[in-house]
Amino acid sequence: MDFLNRVFIPNRRQRELRELCRYRKSLIVDLGAEKNRLQKMLEGANIKLSGTISDINGKSGKALLDYIVSGEIFDDEAYERLLAEKLISKRLKAPKKQLIKDMQGCISPIQAKMIKVIRTHISELEAHIKELNDDISNHLNEEEENAVELIKDIPGISDTSAQTIVSIIGTDMSRFPTSGALCSWGGLCPGNHESAGKRKNGRTNKGNKLLRSTLVVCAHSAVLKKDSYFGEMYKRIASHRGRKRAIVAVAHAILQIIWQLLKKNERYEDLGSDYFEKKNHKNKLVSTLKRLENFGITLMPEQLAQVAF
């Protein structure tokens, strides 16, 4: 007699894949923290490059940081020299005068040493993350690689996110009877609190933290795509429920779609930003026809054919 639900226990290979993805996630978080620390250190020395270059850790940013740590004065001659050596790009966010002005800070020996340490740590983290990316790619089997390719078609999901999602939920969706069961397991279903027939708002249930956080990040990226289903969904929910709830709702929808894609082995097709408008139009037509029937009015088949659903 089955009184308890079955629990999925991944095999050793999949557990190792999860550990690789989980460790990569922690290193990515550490990398972001170190980059923020570097930015704060520069601002403390009255050097603000965030409005001058798009990526402080890019090629141009690294060349400018080398110059800052050296203690030399950055002037017109230094700018032209770096430009001639192709160490900085001609197409920076700020013009030449603004860049020279932003580089005129006052950096102490201690600050210079700390910047060197932070930059070394950033390089080490980037190297470790790159190594883990290769290990994860080599660890995936053919079925998991196909699943990653299917999931990547969804807006907001990158290679890294797709690999992490597959490492957690696997490729066999038969162990989740419905998409709602998967969302509940992932901690993306709202709490169900009802009293006296009135349903109250509740927090989302507990679930897999790594899966939930990954999907929330994907949702933030997905809603930025113009004229998309997720973008329109976010706008509609955020207008009356708030941004945070809207992001969780989008993450919930993404996980539902992932279940459908893996269950049916289908490619993703965006429903478009006009999906909700068409759906509302159809519902209004159906409601109107029912009201007419209640009044004893029945439309002829040729009249119904003229109604566009």
Q: Language-model segments: which ranges?
A:
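A detector of single, family-specific signature residues
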Residues: 1-309
